């Protein structure tokens, strides 16, 4: 079992990230299946840490349940065994208990073992090009949310979910001006049948642009490897952040390595 940290994050592969905050163990977008085909997507690598090594999980964040690279079979089992899952409103309906759907800009408060509170706020995400056709509910691709995690004595952490919109990042930065760290989904995910094969998540150049918008926040990239439809990887991120002069803000380490988080 991996030991709990006081305040830290680690990316396990794909989008899956563990955050230890205020005595809570939080997992975002859990994907623990073995490599292989998952419908029209193909997974190429398993996680750096398996779900049985995590120990008890207090909270699962699911940006969307529609795609297996964000919630696969074993990730779904982990989520449904947790005390609480926070996700989209439509996703909560599909997942059932213990999932709670959060409308945009609403918050859910989670008690912390240290006596404080963790506040989880749902923020927007656009899962594809801004000008793409939207569904009947106004969503590109499907309903997706990101999350702002905050609380007394804790860093403010933004988990982006699958977002391709710089405008959305700017809106979040305006409304949450004191973000300390960002789990930023990148990878320029592309599916030929969707939106003329345009990116469904941030490419590396736009990830660096998002970092510039987000001020002094440390950037922890996720969602850039482990699946064949991710068209950009680690080297692209390193190059883009170097070109932008933002390498000092980039926290790109081996999967399973803890990154300390500070207010």
For each predicted feature, which ranges?
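Alpha-helix capping/helix-boundary segments
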Residues: 67, 75, 91-92, 106-107, ...
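Metallo-beta-lactamase
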Residues: 1-4, 85-155, 239-262
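Active-site neighborhood of phospho(di)ester-bond hydrolases with catalytic His/Asp-centered motifs
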Residues: 27-29, 56-71, 86-89, 157-163, ...
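Conserved catalytic scaffold of divalent metal-dependent phosphoesterases
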Residues: 27-34, 102-110, 117-128, 165, ...
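Pre-active-site segment of Zn-dependent metallo-hydrolases
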Residues: 21-62, 66-69, 73-78, 128-137, ...
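Conserved beta-strand elements of the Class I
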Residues: 10, 18, 27, 58-61, ...
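Cap/insert and terminal regions of metallo-dependent hydrolase folds
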Residues: 90-93, 164-255
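Zn-dependent metallo-beta-lactamase
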Residues: 1-27, 31-36, 40-44, 126, ...
């Amino acid at each position: 079992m991996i030991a709990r940290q006081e305040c830290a994050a680690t990316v396990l592969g794909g989008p899956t990230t563990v955050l230890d905050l205020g005595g809570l163990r939080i997992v975002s977008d859990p994907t623990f299946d073995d490599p292989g085909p998952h419908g029209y997507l193909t997974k190429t690598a398993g996680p750096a840490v398996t779900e049985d090594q995590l120990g008890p999980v207090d909270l699962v964040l699911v940006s969307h349940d529609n795609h297996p690279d964000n919630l696969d079979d074993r990730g779904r089992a982990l989520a449904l065994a947790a005390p609480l899952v926070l996700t989209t409103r439509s996703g909560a309906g599909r997942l059932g208990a213990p999932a709670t759907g959060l409308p945009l800009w609403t918050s859910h408060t989670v008690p912390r073992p240290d006596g404080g509170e963790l506040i989880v706020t749902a923020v927007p995400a656009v899962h594809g090009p801004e000008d793409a056709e939207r569904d009947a509910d106004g969503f590109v691709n499907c309903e997706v949310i990101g999350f702002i995690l905050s609380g007394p004595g804790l860093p403010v952490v933004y988990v982006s979910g699958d977002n391709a919109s710089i405008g959305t990042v700017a809106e979040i930065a305006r409304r949450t001006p004191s973000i300390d760290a960002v789990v930023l989904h990148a990878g320029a995910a592309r599916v030929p049948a969707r939106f003329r094969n345009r990116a469904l998540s941030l490419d590396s150049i736009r990830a660096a642009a998002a970092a510039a918008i987000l001020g002094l926040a440390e950037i922890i990239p996720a969602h850039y490897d482990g699946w064949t439809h991710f068209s950009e990887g680690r080297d692209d991120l390193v190059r883009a952040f170097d070109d932008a002069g933002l390498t000092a803000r980039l926290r790109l380490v081996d999967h399973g390595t803890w990154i300390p988080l500070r207010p």
